[in-house]
Amino acid sequence: MAHVPDCDPEEDHEKLETDKYAFYVNFVRDQGDALEIAEKYREEKGIQSIILCPGFTNEEVGELSETLDDVSVNVARGDGPSGRIAQEAMQKAGWFE
């Protein structure tokens, strides 16, 4: 799941799968969208884990973890330089406007 300010969570999603694994990707605008989509995926698709983009704050990760108590909640974070590079790229793209 990734924060994308100009997305439509109901439209901006995809599923990749093999015979043994299903991987769902969903863009969300904010924490409200994230909670709604995550609960929907747990109930309708039976997800067992979720991977969040680095844009989720520790507080948001905690809230998702509390809400999805039976789902593993993980965050894809890089090292210090990677975070800075990603932040600069997002700023150039107008992410924070």
Predicted regions: what they are:
Residues P81-E88:
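Short, charged, surface-exposed secondary-structure boundary motifs
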Residues M1-D8:
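N-terminal basic/disordered segments at the start of proteins
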